[in-house]
């Protein structure tokens, strides 16, 4: 159109654990016109590093939003107003970690802004969001650089206090190196350090407990449209084992993914 490309999208996602636990939900549903996008969509916080080790967002990274993005090719900038209507999730570090403070009910509002650029073999973006109900915000930077046989990724995140966008820790640094071993095989070792993981009743970060994690993600293209992914991660949380999420643990998954 004279206002730019017009696009509508509806995505459905189904899950079946057993005969009595199954269902299909709307994954995304939005309209785009030029740089304007409105509807139910993933936020920019969903776009973290490519591997499966990092924890760079909190709570639900999807909801109703009104977004505008200006894209000049090697540079882009965007602003988004988001409805923060989902409940508060458990910590992504460990479900045993008790989050202090509290969130109010649904229909809260958040504001996000992002800028990004590409400089030769390097791409980078800086994302900032503010939770108007919690009166706290978070900033996250991600940089990718093509180095040798793979791509190096580095990210840092900081939060002023507990908020909908990021409340896993007061700050964190994550790095990965995605090695393109063959046309079909990519191996991505990664590590992350999270500083000050506890939240006080006033929603401020408190204490001196930290956590770190390391792992590897393996992606293999079996054939056109069929991929396999295997991820294994090790994590260590400060404190007395078994108390408030402290101790070490191993996690992982195996996934077959069909694309059309």
Give a label for each model feature.
Residues 220-222, 246-260:
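Outer-membrane beta-barrel "beta-signal"
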Residues 1, 12-14, 72, 81-83, ...:
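Short beta-strand segments enriched in hydrophobic/aromatic residues
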Residues 1-88, 112-123:
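Outer membrane beta-barrel
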Residues 13-19, 43-54, 82-104, 122, ...:
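Sequence/structural signature of outer-membrane beta-barrel proteins
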Residues 27-29, 34, 62-66, 75, ...:
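Hydrophobic, lipid-facing positions within transmembrane beta-strands of outer-membrane proteins
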Residues 211-240:
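C-terminal structured domain segments
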Residues 106-215:
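Detector for outer-membrane/organellar transmembrane beta-barrel domains
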Residues 5-6, 34-38, 74-79, 119-126, ...:
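Repeated loop/turn-to-beta-strand initiation elements of outer-membrane beta-barrel proteins
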């Amino acid at each position: 159109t004279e206002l730019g490309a017009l696009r509508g999208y509806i995505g459905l996602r189904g899950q079946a654990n057993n005969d009595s636990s199954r269902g299909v939900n709307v994954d995304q549903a939005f309209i785009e016109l030029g740089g304007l996008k409105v509807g139910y969509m993933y936020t920019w916080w969903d776009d973290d590093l490519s591997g499966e080790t990092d924890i760079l967002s909190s709570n639900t990274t999807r909801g109703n939003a009104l977004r505008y993005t200006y894209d000049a090719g090697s540079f882009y900038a965007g602003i988004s107003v988001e409805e923060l209507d989902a409940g508060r999730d458990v910590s992504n570090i460990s479900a045993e970690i008790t989050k202090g403070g509290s969130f109010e009910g649904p229909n809260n509002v958040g504001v996000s802004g992002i800028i990004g650029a590409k400089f030769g073999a390097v791409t980078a973006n800086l994302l900032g969001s503010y939770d108007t109900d919690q009166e706290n915000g978070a900033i996250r930077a991600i940089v990718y650089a093509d180095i040798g046989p793979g791509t190096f990724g580095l990210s840092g995140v900081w939060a002023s206090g507990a908020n909908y966008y990021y409340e896993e820790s007061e700050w964190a640094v994550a790095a990965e190196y995605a090695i393109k071993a063959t046309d079909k095989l990519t191996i991505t070792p990664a590590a992350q350090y999270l500083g000050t993981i506890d939240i006080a009743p006033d929603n401020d970060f408190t204490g001196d407990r930290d956590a770190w994690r390391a792992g590897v993600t393996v992606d293999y293209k079996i054939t056109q449209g069929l991929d396999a992914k295997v991820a294994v991660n090790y994590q260590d949380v400060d404190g007395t084992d078994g108390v408030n999420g402290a101790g070490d643990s191993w996690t992982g998954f195996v996934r077959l993914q069909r694309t059309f």
